[in-house]
Amino acid sequence: MRLFINTTDFNTSTMKSTLILSACLLATTAGFSQDDNLPKPELTEVWEPVPSIVTPASKPGDPPADAIVLFNGKNLDEWMSPKEPTGPAKWTLADGIITVKKGTGPIRTKRSFMDYQFHLEYRIPSNITGSGQARGNSGIFFAATGQGDSGYELQVLDGYNNKTYVNGQVGSIYKQHIPLANASRKPGEWQTYDVVWTAPRFKDDGSLESPARITVLHNGVLVQNNVAIKGETTYRGEPSYKKHGPGPILLQDHGDPSEPISYRNIWIREIK
């Protein structure tokens, strides 16, 4: 019995296999060649400066190890009343919280700050009355620039089923930026503000070099996203800047007839 081999088919099959293998080798070699032409990965590794170690709080919202505690529930040593700068802060301290004392004016920090991370908790009283801007109104003024309600205001107000103009509701940069959301809790519940503040910069001649910027989380919800502030808060007219340096933080005694609001757990981390 004679065995016949189709040499044409054999040679064609062998040639195809050889071509496929060669193509794979070329592709692999080309890949290695391309990698050889790239910069070494070490050239884009940064090793210094090493970030400082900050021990976080054991409970969310409490101050981390490097924070300056502005109110610890025990005293008002970090605060003063602008109306009487040499005396103690006039608000009421009881049961680990401070409550606005109507008619005494605002309180502000004794220290001044530039750029920082800031945390504060507040409570609208459960028996709150009034409506609109006359319902649990207060405010946080960053870089307070005078004795009264001056600086850049983040609004504090009852925002739970309380209608008012939207650039004046809770979470707004008052009369400048509408909040991205209304994250208000019911009156009687504690609420939080977490803020990243970048102070404005000024040229030697007093003109603005870069505006203040602010990011705000209200009860953990982003309501202001690195917005540029147009100038100091004003009730009437357009905001504007005047040159200043580091400034204190001021809590407002608004003066409306509704029941006073309370604050606790206030701290700050300077950003340098």
PLM regions: where:
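Bacterial Sec-dependent N-terminal signal peptides
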Residues: 1-34
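Carbohydrate-interacting regions of secretory-pathway proteins
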Residues: 32-272
